[in-house]
Amino acid sequence: MQLIDTNIRDFDQLRREHRWQIPENFNMAEAVCDRHAMDEDRVALFTETATGRCNRFTFAQLKELSNRFANALRSMGVTVGDRVAIVLPQRVETGLCHLAAWKLGAISLPLSILFGPDALRYRLEDSGARVVIAAGAALDRVHALMPDLPSLERVIDCDDQRDGFWPLLEKGSAGLEPIQTQSDDPALIIYTSGTTGPPKGAVVAHRCLLGNLTGFEMSQNFFPQEGDLMWTPADWAWTGGLLDALIPAWYYGCPVLGYDGGRFDAEQACHMIARYRVRNAFIPPTALKMMRQVGDLRALGVDLRSVMSAGETLGAQLYEWAMSALGIGINEMCGQTEFNYIIGNCSEIMPVKPGSMGKAYPGHVVEPMDENGCKLPIGKIGELFAHRDDPVMFLGYWNREQETKEKLNGDWWSTGDIGYRDDEGYLWFVGRKDDVISSAGHRIGPGEIEDCMLKHPAVLQAAAIGSPDKLRGEIVKAFIVLADGFKASKGLQEEIQNTVRTSLAAYEYPREIEFVHDLPLTTTGKVRRVELRERERRRKGLTNS
Protein backbone atom coordinates (compact mmCIF):
# COMPACT_ATOMS: atom_id res chain seq x y z
CA MET A 1 0.00 0.00 0.00
CA GLN A 2 3.01 2.32 0.43
CA LEU A 3 3.98 4.42 -2.58
CA ILE A 4 7.61 4.67 -1.49
CA ASP A 5 9.93 1.65 -1.75
CA THR A 6 11.24 1.38 1.81
CA ASN A 7 14.12 -0.82 0.64
CA ILE A 8 15.65 2.17 -1.15
CA ARG A 9 17.45 4.38 1.34
CA ASP A 10 18.60 7.06 -1.07
CA PHE A 11 16.34 10.11 -1.42
CA ASP A 12 17.54 11.10 -4.88
CA GLN A 13 17.18 7.53 -6.19
CA LEU A 14 13.60 7.46 -4.92
CA ARG A 15 12.92 10.67 -6.82
CA ARG A 16 14.45 9.33 -10.03
CA GLU A 17 12.57 6.03 -9.96
CA HIS A 18 9.12 7.19 -8.84
CA ARG A 19 6.22 6.94 -11.32
CA TRP A 20 2.64 7.90 -10.54
CA GLN A 21 -0.13 5.36 -11.12
CA ILE A 22 -3.40 7.27 -10.81
CA PRO A 23 -6.56 5.23 -11.46
CA GLU A 24 -9.31 6.63 -13.67
CA ASN A 25 -11.88 6.15 -10.90
CA PHE A 26 -11.06 7.07 -7.32
CA ASN A 27 -13.18 8.14 -4.36
CA MET A 28 -11.55 9.36 -1.18
CA ALA A 29 -14.29 8.02 1.09
CA GLU A 30 -13.84 4.49 -0.22
CA ALA A 31 -10.05 4.79 -0.09
CA VAL A 32 -9.75 6.15 3.44
CA CYS A 33 -12.65 4.38 5.13
CA ASP A 34 -14.74 1.73 3.41
CA ARG A 35 -11.91 -0.53 2.25
CA HIS A 36 -10.65 -0.84 5.85
CA ALA A 37 -14.09 -1.72 7.24
CA MET A 38 -13.74 -5.46 6.54
CA ASP A 39 -11.68 -5.66 9.74
CA GLU A 40 -14.44 -4.81 12.21
CA ASP A 41 -12.00 -4.13 15.06
CA ARG A 42 -9.68 -1.78 13.18
CA VAL A 43 -9.64 1.53 15.07
CA ALA A 44 -9.91 4.71 13.00
CA LEU A 45 -10.38 7.47 15.55
CA PHE A 46 -9.94 8.27 19.21
CA THR A 47 -11.67 11.46 20.39
CA GLU A 48 -11.40 13.39 23.62
CA THR A 49 -13.04 16.59 24.83
CA ALA A 50 -11.94 19.25 27.30
CA THR A 51 -14.21 17.65 29.91
CA GLY A 52 -12.43 14.31 29.51
CA ARG A 53 -15.15 12.52 27.54
CA CYS A 54 -13.47 9.87 25.38
CA ASN A 55 -14.71 7.79 22.47
CA ARG A 56 -13.30 5.26 20.04
CA PHE A 57 -14.55 4.55 16.51
CA THR A 58 -13.63 1.76 14.12
CA PHE A 59 -13.52 2.03 10.34
CA ALA A 60 -16.54 -0.27 10.22
CA GLN A 61 -18.47 2.17 12.40
CA LEU A 62 -17.37 5.15 10.29
CA LYS A 63 -18.51 3.36 7.14
CA GLU A 64 -21.96 2.66 8.53
CA LEU A 65 -22.41 6.10 10.10
CA SER A 66 -21.22 7.96 6.99
CA ASN A 67 -23.52 5.83 4.83
CA ARG A 68 -26.44 6.79 7.04
CA PHE A 69 -25.59 10.49 6.91
CA ALA A 70 -25.05 10.33 3.14
CA ASN A 71 -28.56 8.92 2.78
CA ALA A 72 -29.88 11.67 5.05
CA LEU A 73 -28.19 14.30 2.85
CA ARG A 74 -29.56 12.63 -0.26
CA SER A 75 -33.07 12.85 1.18
CA MET A 76 -32.52 16.63 1.44
CA GLY A 77 -31.70 16.76 -2.26
CA VAL A 78 -27.90 16.88 -1.99
CA THR A 79 -26.40 15.46 -5.17
CA VAL A 80 -23.24 15.40 -7.29
CA GLY A 81 -21.35 18.70 -7.16
CA ASP A 82 -23.36 20.28 -4.34
CA ARG A 83 -21.36 22.01 -1.62
CA VAL A 84 -21.69 20.78 1.97
CA ALA A 85 -20.09 23.13 4.52
CA ILE A 86 -18.60 21.74 7.74
CA VAL A 87 -17.95 24.17 10.61
CA LEU A 88 -16.74 21.80 13.32
CA PRO A 89 -13.65 21.14 15.47
CA GLN A 90 -11.80 17.83 15.85
CA ARG A 91 -14.78 15.54 16.48
CA VAL A 92 -16.11 12.42 14.78
CA GLU A 93 -18.92 14.29 13.01
CA THR A 94 -16.30 16.25 11.06
CA GLY A 95 -14.91 13.12 9.46
CA LEU A 96 -18.36 11.64 8.90
CA CYS A 97 -19.56 14.76 7.07
CA HIS A 98 -16.61 14.68 4.67
CA LEU A 99 -17.01 10.95 4.02
CA ALA A 100 -20.76 11.29 3.43
CA ALA A 101 -20.33 14.19 1.01
CA TRP A 102 -17.67 12.34 -1.01
CA LYS A 103 -19.83 9.21 -1.20
CA LEU A 104 -22.53 11.30 -2.90
CA GLY A 105 -20.08 12.96 -5.28
CA ALA A 106 -20.72 16.23 -3.44
CA ILE A 107 -18.01 18.73 -2.49
CA SER A 108 -17.16 19.22 1.17
CA LEU A 109 -16.34 22.73 2.35
CA PRO A 110 -14.32 22.80 5.60
CA LEU A 111 -14.63 26.09 7.51
CA SER A 112 -12.94 27.12 10.74
CA ILE A 113 -14.97 27.42 13.94
CA LEU A 114 -12.94 30.60 14.55
CA PHE A 115 -14.53 32.41 11.61
CA GLY A 116 -16.69 35.39 12.46
CA PRO A 117 -19.86 36.34 10.56
CA ASP A 118 -18.15 38.24 7.74
CA ALA A 119 -15.71 35.42 6.99
CA LEU A 120 -18.50 32.82 7.08
CA ARG A 121 -20.87 34.90 4.97
CA TYR A 122 -18.32 35.42 2.22
CA ARG A 123 -17.32 31.75 1.96
CA LEU A 124 -20.84 30.37 2.17
CA GLU A 125 -22.13 32.86 -0.39
CA ASP A 126 -19.20 32.45 -2.77
CA SER A 127 -19.36 28.65 -2.68
CA GLY A 128 -23.15 28.47 -2.87
CA ALA A 129 -23.25 25.90 -0.07
CA ARG A 130 -26.63 24.15 0.22
CA VAL A 131 -26.11 22.56 3.64
CA VAL A 132 -24.09 23.55 6.71
CA ILE A 133 -23.24 21.26 9.63
CA ALA A 134 -22.12 23.16 12.73
CA ALA A 135 -22.32 23.35 16.51
CA GLY A 136 -21.99 25.84 19.35
CA ALA A 137 -21.17 29.48 18.64
CA ALA A 138 -20.44 28.75 14.97
CA LEU A 139 -23.97 27.38 14.59
CA ASP A 140 -25.44 30.60 16.00
CA ARG A 141 -23.40 32.68 13.55
CA VAL A 142 -24.56 30.58 10.59
CA HIS A 143 -28.22 30.75 11.67
CA ALA A 144 -27.98 34.55 11.83
CA LEU A 145 -26.62 34.62 8.26
CA MET A 146 -29.30 32.44 6.66
CA PRO A 147 -31.48 35.35 5.45
CA ASP A 148 -28.48 36.65 3.46
CA LEU A 149 -27.68 33.28 1.86
CA PRO A 150 -30.34 32.24 -0.69
CA SER A 151 -28.50 29.04 -1.68
CA LEU A 152 -28.33 27.78 1.93
CA GLU A 153 -31.28 25.42 2.45
CA ARG A 154 -30.45 23.55 5.65
CA VAL A 155 -28.36 24.09 8.79
CA ILE A 156 -27.76 20.96 10.88
CA ASP A 157 -26.93 21.17 14.59
CA CYS A 158 -24.54 18.45 15.75
CA ASP A 159 -25.68 18.85 19.35
CA ASP A 160 -29.46 18.90 18.84
CA GLN A 161 -30.70 15.56 20.13
CA ARG A 162 -34.19 16.02 18.64
CA ASP A 163 -33.73 17.17 15.05
CA GLY A 164 -29.95 17.45 14.71
CA PHE A 165 -27.12 15.43 13.21
CA TRP A 166 -27.51 12.18 15.15
CA PRO A 167 -31.31 11.87 14.86
CA LEU A 168 -31.00 12.49 11.11
CA LEU A 169 -28.27 9.90 10.87
CA GLU A 170 -30.37 7.30 12.70
CA LYS A 171 -33.18 7.78 10.17
CA GLY A 172 -30.83 7.14 7.24
CA SER A 173 -30.29 3.67 5.84
CA ALA A 174 -26.95 1.95 6.47
CA GLY A 175 -26.91 0.65 2.90
CA LEU A 176 -25.29 2.85 0.27
CA GLU A 177 -23.53 2.40 -3.05
CA PRO A 178 -21.13 5.37 -3.25
CA ILE A 179 -21.00 7.38 -6.47
CA GLN A 180 -18.16 6.15 -8.67
CA THR A 181 -16.21 9.38 -8.92
CA GLN A 182 -13.37 9.92 -11.34
CA SER A 183 -10.02 10.82 -9.83
CA ASP A 184 -10.29 14.29 -11.41
CA ASP A 185 -13.70 15.01 -9.87
CA PRO A 186 -13.81 17.74 -7.19
CA ALA A 187 -13.87 16.60 -3.56
CA LEU A 188 -13.16 19.73 -1.52
CA ILE A 189 -13.15 23.50 -1.67
CA ILE A 190 -10.66 25.05 0.74
CA TYR A 191 -10.48 28.83 0.88
CA THR A 192 -6.95 30.18 0.65
CA SER A 193 -5.58 33.48 1.86
CA GLY A 194 -6.31 36.44 -0.37
CA THR A 195 -3.44 38.90 -0.77
CA THR A 196 -5.47 41.31 -2.86
CA GLY A 197 -9.20 41.12 -2.59
CA PRO A 198 -11.15 38.29 -1.00
CA PRO A 199 -9.98 34.70 -0.34
CA LYS A 200 -10.27 32.23 -3.21
CA GLY A 201 -11.78 28.75 -3.07
CA ALA A 202 -9.21 26.16 -4.14
CA VAL A 203 -10.99 23.17 -5.68
CA VAL A 204 -9.22 19.96 -4.66
CA ALA A 205 -9.76 16.73 -6.64
CA HIS A 206 -10.07 13.22 -5.22
CA ARG A 207 -6.70 12.37 -6.84
CA CYS A 208 -4.95 15.10 -4.84
CA LEU A 209 -4.90 12.74 -1.85
CA LEU A 210 -2.76 10.30 -3.86
CA GLY A 211 -0.47 13.15 -4.86
CA ASN A 212 0.03 13.93 -1.16
CA LEU A 213 1.19 10.48 -0.21
CA THR A 214 4.86 10.35 -1.23
CA GLY A 215 5.49 13.46 0.83
CA PHE A 216 3.33 12.21 3.70
CA GLU A 217 5.12 8.86 3.86
CA MET A 218 8.57 10.45 3.83
CA SER A 219 7.83 13.37 6.15
CA GLN A 220 6.61 10.78 8.67
CA ASN A 221 9.75 8.67 8.15
CA PHE A 222 8.22 5.89 6.05
CA PHE A 223 4.66 5.86 7.30
CA PRO A 224 3.00 3.54 8.18
CA GLN A 225 4.80 1.29 10.62
CA GLU A 226 3.53 -1.03 13.33
CA GLY A 227 1.92 0.95 16.15
CA ASP A 228 1.65 4.24 14.26
CA LEU A 229 -1.00 6.66 15.55
CA MET A 230 -1.40 10.20 14.18
CA TRP A 231 -2.22 13.47 15.95
CA THR A 232 -2.09 17.16 15.10
CA PRO A 233 -3.15 20.31 16.94
CA ALA A 234 -3.96 21.83 13.54
CA ASP A 235 -7.63 22.50 12.86
CA TRP A 236 -9.21 19.90 10.56
CA ALA A 237 -10.76 22.81 8.66
CA TRP A 238 -7.41 23.56 7.01
CA THR A 239 -5.25 21.70 4.52
CA GLY A 240 -2.68 20.98 7.25
CA GLY A 241 -5.02 19.27 9.69
CA LEU A 242 -7.25 17.57 7.12
CA LEU A 243 -5.03 16.60 4.17
CA ASP A 244 -1.66 16.43 5.94
CA ALA A 245 -2.80 14.37 8.94
CA LEU A 246 -6.34 12.99 9.28
CA ILE A 247 -7.14 11.82 5.75
CA PRO A 248 -3.73 10.37 4.72
CA ALA A 249 -3.45 8.47 8.01
CA TRP A 250 -6.86 6.95 7.33
CA TYR A 251 -5.74 6.03 3.81
CA TYR A 252 -3.27 3.63 5.41
CA GLY A 253 -5.84 2.37 7.90
CA CYS A 254 -4.04 3.97 10.86
CA PRO A 255 -5.80 5.52 13.86
CA VAL A 256 -5.95 9.26 14.48
CA LEU A 257 -6.42 11.15 17.75
CA GLY A 258 -8.80 14.11 17.67
CA TYR A 259 -9.07 16.61 20.53
CA ASP A 260 -11.98 19.01 20.89
CA GLY A 261 -10.73 21.20 23.70
CA GLY A 262 -10.37 24.74 22.45
CA ARG A 263 -7.12 26.67 22.62
CA PHE A 264 -3.86 24.70 22.38
CA ASP A 265 -2.33 23.84 25.76
CA ALA A 266 1.21 22.47 25.40
CA GLU A 267 1.37 20.62 28.72
CA GLN A 268 -2.05 19.07 28.24
CA ALA A 269 -1.05 18.06 24.70
CA CYS A 270 2.09 16.31 25.97
CA HIS A 271 0.10 14.32 28.53
CA MET A 272 -2.38 13.34 25.83
CA ILE A 273 0.40 12.26 23.44
CA ALA A 274 1.75 10.01 26.19
CA ARG A 275 -1.65 8.67 27.26
CA TYR A 276 -2.68 7.59 23.75
CA ARG A 277 0.85 6.56 22.73
CA VAL A 278 0.88 8.91 19.76
CA ARG A 279 3.74 7.98 17.44
CA ASN A 280 3.36 10.46 14.57
CA ALA A 281 2.41 14.11 14.46
CA PHE A 282 2.09 17.22 12.39
CA ILE A 283 3.05 20.02 14.79
CA PRO A 284 3.47 23.61 13.52
CA PRO A 285 6.56 25.48 14.78
CA THR A 286 4.52 27.72 17.09
CA ALA A 287 3.13 24.68 18.93
CA LEU A 288 6.62 23.17 19.14
CA LYS A 289 7.91 26.39 20.71
CA MET A 290 5.18 26.17 23.33
CA MET A 291 5.97 22.50 23.99
CA ARG A 292 9.60 23.47 24.50
CA GLN A 293 8.53 25.38 27.61
CA VAL A 294 6.94 22.30 29.22
CA GLY A 295 10.20 20.70 30.36
CA ASP A 296 11.42 17.12 29.99
CA LEU A 297 9.01 15.68 27.42
CA ARG A 298 10.33 12.15 27.56
CA ALA A 299 9.89 12.14 31.34
CA LEU A 300 6.21 12.88 30.66
CA GLY A 301 6.02 9.82 28.43
CA VAL A 302 6.21 11.54 25.04
CA ASP A 303 7.66 8.98 22.62
CA LEU A 304 7.15 10.19 19.06
CA ARG A 305 8.56 8.25 16.11
CA SER A 306 8.14 11.05 13.57
CA VAL A 307 7.10 14.70 13.42
CA MET A 308 6.37 16.84 10.37
CA SER A 309 6.25 20.61 10.76
CA ALA A 310 4.96 23.24 8.34
CA GLY A 311 3.26 26.61 8.09
CA GLU A 312 6.30 28.71 8.91
CA THR A 313 10.08 28.28 9.05
CA LEU A 314 11.24 25.84 11.73
CA GLY A 315 14.69 27.32 12.33
CA ALA A 316 17.94 25.76 13.55
CA GLN A 317 17.36 26.33 17.29
CA LEU A 318 13.97 24.63 17.32
CA TYR A 319 15.29 21.75 15.22
CA GLU A 320 18.21 21.19 17.60
CA TRP A 321 15.91 21.36 20.64
CA ALA A 322 13.68 18.66 19.11
CA MET A 323 16.69 16.46 18.42
CA SER A 324 17.62 16.71 22.08
CA ALA A 325 14.14 16.64 23.65
CA LEU A 326 12.46 14.11 21.35
CA GLY A 327 15.41 12.21 19.95
CA ILE A 328 14.21 12.67 16.36
CA GLY A 329 14.79 15.07 13.50
CA ILE A 330 11.77 17.22 12.68
CA ASN A 331 10.88 16.97 9.00
CA GLU A 332 10.02 20.41 7.71
CA MET A 333 7.55 20.40 4.79
CA CYS A 334 6.39 23.06 2.37
CA GLY A 335 3.24 23.14 0.31
CA GLN A 336 0.09 25.08 -0.49
CA THR A 337 -3.56 24.12 -0.77
CA GLU A 338 -3.23 24.54 -4.54
CA PHE A 339 -0.10 22.37 -4.75
CA ASN A 340 0.35 20.56 -1.46
CA TYR A 341 3.13 18.45 0.06
CA ILE A 342 5.70 18.97 -2.68
CA ILE A 343 8.90 19.88 -0.79
CA GLY A 344 10.33 18.59 2.46
CA ASN A 345 12.66 16.34 4.38
CA CYS A 346 12.95 12.72 5.49
CA SER A 347 15.41 12.56 8.38
CA GLU A 348 15.38 8.76 8.20
CA ILE A 349 17.46 8.73 5.01
CA MET A 350 18.74 12.26 4.35
CA PRO A 351 20.70 14.87 6.30
CA VAL A 352 18.40 17.68 7.36
CA LYS A 353 19.75 21.18 6.88
CA PRO A 354 17.99 23.35 9.47
CA GLY A 355 16.52 26.37 7.73
CA SER A 356 16.23 24.61 4.37
CA MET A 357 12.88 23.68 2.86
CA GLY A 358 14.34 20.28 1.92
CA LYS A 359 14.02 18.72 -1.51
CA ALA A 360 11.13 18.07 -3.87
CA TYR A 361 9.48 14.82 -2.78
CA PRO A 362 9.27 11.91 -5.26
CA GLY A 363 6.78 12.62 -8.03
CA HIS A 364 7.08 16.41 -7.76
CA VAL A 365 9.24 18.82 -9.76
CA VAL A 366 10.09 22.27 -8.36
CA GLU A 367 12.43 24.77 -10.00
CA PRO A 368 13.64 28.31 -9.21
CA MET A 369 13.00 30.44 -12.32
CA ASP A 370 13.63 33.97 -13.49
CA GLU A 371 11.00 36.43 -14.67
CA ASN A 372 11.19 34.95 -18.20
CA GLY A 373 10.37 31.44 -17.00
CA CYS A 374 13.92 30.14 -17.43
CA LYS A 375 15.38 27.71 -14.90
CA LEU A 376 18.07 29.27 -12.75
CA PRO A 377 21.49 27.80 -11.92
CA ILE A 378 22.54 26.71 -8.43
CA GLY A 379 22.57 29.54 -5.91
CA LYS A 380 20.57 31.98 -8.03
CA ILE A 381 17.42 33.37 -6.41
CA GLY A 382 14.12 33.26 -8.26
CA GLU A 383 10.49 32.33 -7.93
CA LEU A 384 9.77 28.66 -7.19
CA PHE A 385 7.58 27.00 -9.83
CA ALA A 386 6.05 23.52 -9.64
CA HIS A 387 5.39 21.42 -12.74
CA ARG A 388 1.65 21.05 -13.27
CA ASP A 389 1.80 17.43 -14.52
CA ASP A 390 1.27 16.28 -10.96
CA PRO A 391 -1.72 14.58 -9.26
CA VAL A 392 -1.46 16.87 -6.24
CA MET A 393 -2.21 20.00 -8.26
CA PHE A 394 -5.65 21.44 -7.59
CA LEU A 395 -8.33 21.88 -10.26
CA GLY A 396 -8.51 25.68 -10.08
CA TYR A 397 -10.07 28.50 -8.09
CA TRP A 398 -13.83 28.25 -7.63
CA ASN A 399 -15.53 30.43 -10.29
CA ARG A 400 -12.22 32.25 -10.92
CA GLU A 401 -10.85 30.82 -14.14
CA GLN A 402 -8.89 33.95 -15.02
CA GLU A 403 -7.16 34.09 -11.64
CA THR A 404 -6.19 30.44 -12.05
CA LYS A 405 -4.69 31.14 -15.48
CA GLU A 406 -2.71 34.06 -14.09
CA LYS A 407 -0.82 31.69 -11.77
CA LEU A 408 0.29 29.47 -14.66
CA ASN A 409 3.35 29.92 -16.83
CA GLY A 410 3.00 27.26 -19.51
CA ASP A 411 3.36 23.92 -17.75
CA TRP A 412 4.45 25.52 -14.48
CA TRP A 413 2.51 26.73 -11.45
CA SER A 414 3.64 29.88 -9.67
CA THR A 415 4.02 29.17 -5.93
CA GLY A 416 4.63 32.82 -5.12
CA ASP A 417 7.64 31.82 -3.01
CA ILE A 418 11.12 33.14 -3.69
CA GLY A 419 14.09 30.84 -3.14
CA TYR A 420 17.09 29.02 -4.59
CA ARG A 421 18.64 25.55 -4.84
CA ASP A 422 22.04 24.80 -3.30
CA ASP A 423 24.73 22.51 -4.73
CA GLU A 424 23.29 19.48 -2.92
CA GLY A 425 19.78 19.96 -4.29
CA TYR A 426 18.22 21.50 -1.18
CA LEU A 427 15.76 24.34 -1.69
CA TRP A 428 15.98 27.46 0.47
CA PHE A 429 13.16 29.90 1.12
CA VAL A 430 14.04 33.60 0.79
CA GLY A 431 10.68 35.35 0.92
CA ARG A 432 7.20 35.60 -0.57
CA LYS A 433 6.33 37.13 -3.87
CA ASP A 434 2.87 37.77 -2.52
CA ASP A 435 1.96 39.26 0.83
CA VAL A 436 0.51 36.28 2.70
CA ILE A 437 1.18 36.46 6.44
CA SER A 438 2.34 33.24 8.12
CA SER A 439 1.33 33.34 11.78
CA ALA A 440 1.31 30.31 14.10
CA GLY A 441 0.78 27.98 11.15
CA HIS A 442 -2.06 30.05 9.64
CA ARG A 443 -1.71 31.60 6.18
CA ILE A 444 -3.50 34.93 6.47
CA GLY A 445 -4.38 37.20 3.60
CA PRO A 446 -4.05 40.92 4.28
CA GLY A 447 -6.85 41.86 1.88
CA GLU A 448 -9.66 40.48 4.02
CA ILE A 449 -8.24 42.12 7.17
CA GLU A 450 -7.85 45.49 5.46
CA ASP A 451 -11.40 45.34 4.10
CA CYS A 452 -12.68 44.57 7.59
CA MET A 453 -10.79 47.47 9.20
CA LEU A 454 -12.04 49.87 6.54
CA LYS A 455 -15.59 49.24 7.75
CA HIS A 456 -14.72 51.10 10.95
CA PRO A 457 -15.61 54.80 10.60
CA ALA A 458 -12.25 55.88 12.03
CA VAL A 459 -10.21 54.09 9.35
CA LEU A 460 -9.46 56.01 6.16
CA GLN A 461 -6.70 53.74 4.83
CA ALA A 462 -5.28 50.47 6.12
CA ALA A 463 -2.50 48.03 5.30
CA ALA A 464 -1.77 44.71 7.00
CA ILE A 465 1.59 42.94 6.96
CA GLY A 466 3.40 40.18 8.81
CA SER A 467 5.71 41.49 11.52
CA PRO A 468 8.49 39.13 12.72
CA ASP A 469 7.66 37.40 16.01
CA LYS A 470 9.73 34.84 17.93
CA LEU A 471 6.77 32.71 19.00
CA ARG A 472 4.41 32.86 16.03
CA GLY A 473 6.87 33.43 13.20
CA GLU A 474 4.88 36.51 12.25
CA ILE A 475 2.04 38.47 13.78
CA VAL A 476 -0.47 40.61 11.94
CA LYS A 477 0.44 44.29 12.14
CA ALA A 478 -1.79 47.03 10.76
CA PHE A 479 -0.80 50.51 9.59
CA ILE A 480 -3.79 52.84 9.71
CA VAL A 481 -4.43 56.34 8.40
CA LEU A 482 -7.26 57.84 10.46
CA ALA A 483 -10.24 59.66 9.00
CA ASP A 484 -10.79 63.33 9.84
CA GLY A 485 -12.17 63.88 13.31
CA PHE A 486 -10.55 60.83 14.91
CA LYS A 487 -7.48 60.74 17.15
CA ALA A 488 -5.19 57.82 17.85
CA SER A 489 -5.73 56.23 21.25
CA LYS A 490 -5.40 52.92 23.06
CA GLY A 491 -9.18 52.66 23.18
CA LEU A 492 -9.54 53.17 19.43
CA GLN A 493 -6.82 50.61 18.78
CA GLU A 494 -8.64 48.01 20.88
CA GLU A 495 -11.92 48.87 19.16
CA ILE A 496 -10.43 48.22 15.71
CA GLN A 497 -8.78 45.01 16.93
CA ASN A 498 -12.10 43.76 18.27
CA THR A 499 -13.79 44.58 14.97
CA VAL A 500 -11.46 42.17 13.16
CA ARG A 501 -11.47 39.58 15.94
CA THR A 502 -15.25 39.29 16.00
CA SER A 503 -15.91 39.70 12.27
CA LEU A 504 -13.19 37.44 10.85
CA ALA A 505 -11.24 35.17 13.20
CA ALA A 506 -9.25 35.49 16.41
CA TYR A 507 -5.97 34.59 14.71
CA GLU A 508 -6.47 37.29 12.04
CA TYR A 509 -6.78 40.36 14.23
CA PRO A 510 -3.83 42.80 14.20
CA ARG A 511 -1.87 42.29 17.41
CA GLU A 512 -0.08 45.54 16.69
CA ILE A 513 -1.52 48.73 15.20
CA GLU A 514 0.52 51.75 14.17
CA PHE A 515 -1.33 54.95 13.32
CA VAL A 516 0.45 56.77 10.48
CA HIS A 517 -0.06 59.96 8.47
CA ASP A 518 0.15 58.17 5.12
CA LEU A 519 0.93 54.83 3.48
CA PRO A 520 3.63 54.18 0.84
CA LEU A 521 1.87 53.78 -2.50
CA THR A 522 2.82 52.75 -6.03
CA THR A 523 2.16 55.09 -8.94
CA THR A 524 -1.12 53.24 -9.51
CA GLY A 525 -2.22 53.74 -5.91
CA LYS A 526 -1.49 50.26 -4.53
CA VAL A 527 -0.03 49.99 -1.05
CA ARG A 528 3.65 49.03 -1.08
CA ARG A 529 3.49 46.37 1.62
CA VAL A 530 7.06 45.35 0.84
CA GLU A 531 8.21 48.79 2.04
CA LEU A 532 6.21 48.41 5.25
CA ARG A 533 7.71 44.97 5.84
CA GLU A 534 11.23 46.29 5.32
CA ARG A 535 10.52 49.15 7.73
CA GLU A 536 9.21 46.69 10.30
CA ARG A 537 12.25 44.41 10.01
CA ARG A 538 14.57 47.37 10.55
CA ARG A 539 12.54 48.43 13.58
CA LYS A 540 13.00 44.99 15.08
CA GLY A 541 16.72 44.94 14.37
CA LEU A 542 16.56 42.49 11.48
CA THR A 543 18.21 42.74 8.08
CA ASN A 544 17.24 41.33 4.72
CA SER A 545 20.53 39.55 4.23
Question: What residue ranges belong to the model's regions?
Answer:
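AMP-binding/adenylate-forming catalytic domain of the ANL superfamily
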Residues: 502-526, 545
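Conserved AMP-binding A3 loop
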Residues: 55-60, 187-214
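Structural core segment of the AMP-binding/adenylate-forming
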Residues: 75, 99, 103-168
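Conserved pre-ATP/AMP-binding loop-to-beta segment of ANL
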Residues: 41-43, 157, 172-191, 197-198, ...
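Conserved AMP-binding/adenylation subdomain of ANL enzymes
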Residues: 210-232, 237-279, 293-294
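AMP-binding/adenylate-forming catalytic core of the ANL superfamily
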Residues: 115, 132-135, 281, 385, ...
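Gly/Ser/Thr-rich phosphate-binding loop
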Residues: 251, 278-282, 292-352, 365, ...
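Conserved AMP-binding/adenylate-forming core of the ANL superfamily
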Residues: 41, 45-99, 116-121
